[in-house]
Amino acid sequence: MAPSPLEDEDAPLYTVGQVADMLAVKQAFLRRVDELRVVSPQRSAGGQRRYTRYEIRVIQQVVSMADEGITLSAIRRIIDLEQQLAEVTRERDELARRLAALLPEPR
């Protein structure tokens, strides 16, 4: 059974205004984050941005880093590298699991 939209991390539920209110940022900041593709929210049929809970957590990180004086382009690079690291870690873990399945049990 599929999770309900309220339970789904990737369900595009929140408008730009709602996210701006939640995070105490300006809507223009969120639009800039989108323009730089730090996050890329889906669009409603009417073209309105719709953010997922996952994207909101990423934006919270962006706000924290921006408050520390890091530029949005640098933040985008940091997030890209974090995502690449997570992917490589998943691949490594899968390869380790497959290798362990091929090796004989220690005696």
What do the predicted segments below correspond to?
Residues 1-64:
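Basic helix-turn-helix/winged-helix DNA-binding cores
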Residues 65-107:
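Long, leucine- and charge-enriched amphipathic alpha-helices
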